[in-house]
C-alpha cells in the first residue's frame, strides 16, 4: 500500500505547528538538508542584480583631429580653450562624471565623431 500526495497533505493539515516543526527537523536530519539554505541563496542573488545609473565618460585618446575634439570638450563641459586643450592632452581623463546613460551615450557619440577614442564606465 503506497501513500498518495493527497494523503500526505491531509496528514500535514491535521498536525499542530509544533508537530510540523518536529517533522521538518527530522526530515532535515534524515536527508542531510537544511530548509534555511534555500532562503539565504535567493536573497544574495537579488542584491547582485542592481543596474548602474551613473556613468563616467572617459577620453582615452584625442585622435588625429585634435581641434574638433577640443571643441567637443568645450561644448560638453563649458571649459575654456586652455582647459579643454589640457584635458584632451591628458588622456586618459574623465570628461564628465556621474551622468545619465543617455547623456553619456550622446557625449560619446559627439567625441567619437570628432575623432576621439572614448569609453563609458
From Swiss-Prot:
The gene is rplL. This is Large ribosomal subunit protein bL12. Gene3D superfamilies: 3.30.1390.10, Single helix bin. Belongs to the bacterial ribosomal protein bL12 family. Transmembrane segments: none annotated. GO terms for biological process: translation. Keywords: Ribonucleoprotein, Ribosomal protein. One of its GO terms (molecular function) is mRNA binding. GO terms for cellular component: cytosolic large ribosomal subunit. PANTHER family: 39S RIBOSOMAL PROTEIN L12, LARGE RIBOSOMAL SUBUNIT PROTEIN BL12M. The keyword Transport does not apply. Forms part of the ribosomal stalk which helps the ribosome interact with GTP-bound translation factors. Is thus essential for accurate translation. CDD domains: Ribosomal_L7_L12.
Amino acid at each position: 500500500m503506497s501513500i498518495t500526495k493527497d494523503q500526505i497533505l491531509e496528514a500535514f493539515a491535521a498536525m499542530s505547528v509544533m508537530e510540523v516543526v518536529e517533522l521538518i527537523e527530522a526530515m532535515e536530519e534524515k536527508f542531510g538538508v537544511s530548509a534555511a539554505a534555500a532562503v539565504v541563496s535567493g536573497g544574495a542573488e537579488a542584491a547582485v542584480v542592481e543596474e548602474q545609473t551613473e556613468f563616467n565618460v572617459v577620453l582615452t585618446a584625442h585622435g588625429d583631429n585634435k581641434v574638433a575634439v577640443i571643441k567637443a570638450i568645450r561644448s560638453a563641459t563649458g571649459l575654456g580653450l586652455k582647459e579643454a586643450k589640457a584635458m584632451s592632452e591628458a588622456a586618459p581623463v574623465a570628461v564628465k562624471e556621474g551622468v545619465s546613460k543617455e547623456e553619456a551615450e550622446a557625449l560619446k557619440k559627439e567625441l567619437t565623431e570628432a575623432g576621439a577614442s572614448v569609453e563609458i564606465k
